Amino acid sequence: MSCYKVMPIAKNIDDELYELNKLLSEKEEFQLDREYQKEILEKERKFLEDLKTANEVFDKRTLMTLFSLLAGKHLTEYIGIVNSGKEAVVFKARKGKFYRAVKVYRVATCDFKTMSKYIQGDPRFHLRKSSRRQIIHAWVEKEFRNLRRASEIINAPKARLRRENVLVMDFVGYRGIPAPKLKDMQDLDWEKYFKIIKESMKKLYEEGELVHGDLSEYNILVKDDEPVFIDFSQSVITQHPLAHPLLIRDCINICNFFRRKRVDCNYKDLYKYITGKEIDPIDEAMIKQL
């Protein structure tokens, strides 16, 4: 099974920069003029220093992908880490005057078994082999497509580009400050928010033919007094064999949260509102296997 080799950042950052940029310069599309090359070099140096300070380690191929986004002028600079988890790191970046979120999947620690399960049931993808590289590229492509579809229908960040294990999307926040999660909000009109979220789930299902799959107060941000759905990596199309068990779980999570806010919510009623059908006991039993 193929796998990227994880290489810690060199103690001498100049050596690391030299090696990475030598590889980049071999690509014809990255023949940069001297001044721009100097500018990019300083941004790369700062990025590596920030990674070292945060004890973040990426394999060489991932670093090259991130640097190629600077060299190709897809991004202007990386600013800092927004969120760091077991399977992915989210950076804040800029593209001119616009902020971007850059999601980088950790090749060494991703749960490829779970990823494969969600991908293989999706008719949009056909994995002939189960190599780590192929799985993670398909996973990023899946999230990219899901975000593109969702952002046309509901309040969700628009995906801008994907490259290998890196996904670039719109940054949800205020002047570079990340928008708060729903779980951290106080004194909202909870009835109003439940209604908006309920309608968004229904629109996503009916118009987008998507189920979020990991929806909770942790994956909903609040911006301009509106909920914003994020993290569509586990989202599946409605034809997927796990779509309805995942939707039931989403309904349970949402109702559990809003009941704590004293909003009347029953997950079975929410599911029926979204799908127009009663819950199938077989689908509900499958939740334990997710």
From Swiss-Prot:
Domain of life: Archaea
Residues annotated as catalytic: 214 (proton acceptor), 231 (4-aspartylphosphate intermediate)
Domain Protein kinase: 76-290
Keywords (A to Z) from UniProt: ATP-binding, Hydrolase, Kinase, Magnesium, Metal-binding, Nucleotide-binding, Serine/threonine-protein kinase, Transferase
EC number(s) from the headed UniProt entry: 2.7.11.1, 3.6.1.-
Catalytic activity: L-seryl-[protein] + ATP = O-phospho-L-seryl-[protein] + ADP + H(+); L-threonyl-[protein] + ATP = O-phospho-L-threonyl-[protein] + ADP + H(+); ATP + H2O = ADP + phosphate + H(+)
Residues involved in ATP binding: 82-90, 103
GO molecular function, one term: ATP binding
Protein function: Despite the protein kinase domain is proposed to act predominantly as an ATPase.
Name of the protein in question: RIO-type serine/threonine-protein kinase Rio1
Gene expressing this chain: rio1
